[in-house]
Amino acid sequence: MPVERDRIRNFCIIAHIDHGKSTLADRLLEYTGALVGRRMQEQVLDQMDLERERGITIKLQAVRLAYRARDGRDYQLNLIDTPGHVDFSYEVSRSLAACEGALLVVDASQGIEAQTLANVNLALDHNLTIIPIINKIDLASAEPDRVRRELEDVIGLDGADAVLASAKRGDGVEEILERIVRDVPPPGGDPGAPLRALIFDSHYDPYRGVVTYLRLMDGRLFPGGPVRMMATGREFEVSELGVFTPAPVTVNELRAGEVGFMAAGIKNVKDCRVGDTVTDARRPASSPLPGYRKAKPMVYCGLFPVDGAEFEKVRDALDRLSLNDASLVYEPETSTALGFGFRCGFLGLLHMEIIQERLEREYGLDLITTAPSVVYRVTRTNGAVLDIRNPSEMPPAGEIEKMEEPFVLTSLLLPQDYIGPVMELCQDRRGVFRNMEYISTHRVLITYEMPLAEIIYDFFDRLKSATRGYASMDYDLLGYRESKLVRVDILVAGERLDALSIIVHRDRAYHRSKIIVERLRDLIPRQLFEIVIQAAIGQRVIARESIRALRKAVLEKCYGGDVTRKRKLLEKQKEGKKRMKQVGHVQIPQEAFMSVLSIGQK
């Protein structure tokens, strides 16, 4: 039985990691009867094992809830779950475009974090009605009054209006549902107009093909009808329509304002772009919905199968993952040291780790990941501008007019006791101080301009250890700026290992090189000849380590006798070692690559 449009509410939940967003979603599902006893498990909307383990939400989930309000009327609430991590702000923006309201969940003991600010600003950009919720009030360390003041001072929301809740105990859930019904506006749109539906996510089903998640803005959608993707122009026939409750349930119709899913026998990932508009092929809309900005990868790295024969399996796995993850980009590449693999682009470091872990878990692949790098911009002496995603693409130093790297505006929220160590860390990472403001008597918001390359390694880990885990960060891209950058090559026994080349600021080149050559020295097994490991910028060697040769005890049988006899045997051994060094080939073990390329261990 279709519900009138004025009784539909589309909303999402935005929060920083660990502020209780997924637990609150569980309580809303439980309270409205969407989940009963046996099917209830913690973090229902976090369907990936990885999401539950790391306690974060990566993929979007959309659920329809039926709720009878205090006014006695039945309402249809569509909850769109969103990720909270800085890397997934693109997915957050997708879910926001499908909503009219947002629940802003803030931890009563931790207060507003940097990511909360970023997501609230995104929600305000989409003109959403924001309902503030102060969660975890059952904790002994909860300070709801302080958080209310922060909501007013930092975001400009009415703190007295905030709902006090404990998602763990289920306190305040009814009040939240009533506020959604009262404050979130019903969806607009005209059911009689030509169909326009926004694709805000998709997943791949081996039997039904691509299943797209839709929010209908105008018109109506029926099974069996032909639809057209407005960006690609491809046409398909709808085979199935449905909604998530959270289990999928088929329906005979979706109307303007509703959220649901569609299967239409779409076999190719590229045919249904997230952010595209679906329209009726017989009566198409005149213009598509304003599209999303396309997610721009910020961090690149190489993914290579340990076993070269698995290259096609990796390609197939990436194809499937990219279907569920619109922000993953990849292209084939070859490496003399690692063979065939892919150069992949990610939103950030967590995104990269999660993709790698999903490839290994869900597809059973063994992978080597090269050091992450950002996209550098090189202007050649002839005026040509190149985007460098891989150190091996960098032209010779003599042909480079200037090099630029991406800079970001980093916002750091931390307790005032840790200002010193954090500023020292930022200074060490070539940060330029911009601003510092107190958002409460104990908490400070510091902003720095920093090169993205300095953040993608282990900045977040260092920040957490410098502040005992109390700091949170967020960053926004500022654009490209000129920097003194060099390419450092690693040579083992005179052979360049392209997989270990890095682009780094001239001032940090020696420090980084020293760590890499020392680590290789410890990991490459000794041979019968001496192995020299070098780090070089062009022709100039800046760091060097040697692995001493294994020596056979040639003097063992030479008891007593003349010293010249012993010397002769040693000279003969030395000659053999020299000859071996010229023709010998060093096999570098997998662990050596893995260790040098391991992220965040500088």
UniProtKB/Swiss-Prot annotation:
InterPro entries: EF-4, EFG_III/V, EFG_V-like, EFTu-like_2, G_TR_CS, LepA_C_sf, LepA_CTD, LepA_IV. Residues 6-188 form the tr-type G domain. It is found in: Cell membrane. It is a peripheral membrane protein. Its EC number is 3.6.5.n1. GO terms for biological process: positive regulation of translation. GTP binds at residues 18-23, 135-138. It comes from the Bacteria. It holds the Pfam family GTP_EFTU. One of its GO terms (cellular component) is plasma membrane. GO terms for molecular function: GTP binding; GTPase activity; ribosome binding; translation elongation factor activity. It catalyses: GTP + H2O = GDP + phosphate + H(+). Keywords: Cell membrane, GTP-binding, Hydrolase, Membrane, Nucleotide-binding, Protein biosynthesis. Its main location: membrane. Required for accurate and efficient protein synthesis under certain stress conditions. May act as a fidelity factor of the translation reaction, by catalyzing a one-codon backward translocation of tRNAs on improperly translocated ribosomes. Back-translocation proceeds from a post-translocation (POST) complex to a pre-translocation (PRE) complex, thus giving elongation factor G a second chance to translocate the tRNAs correctly. Binds to ribosomes in a GTP-dependent manner. Belongs to the TRAFAC class translation factor GTPase superfamily. Classic translation factor GTPase family. LepA subfamily. This is Elongation factor 4. It comes from Desulforudis audaxviator (strain MP104C). The lineage of its organism: Bacteria, Bacillati, Bacillota, Clostridia, Thermoanaerobacterales.
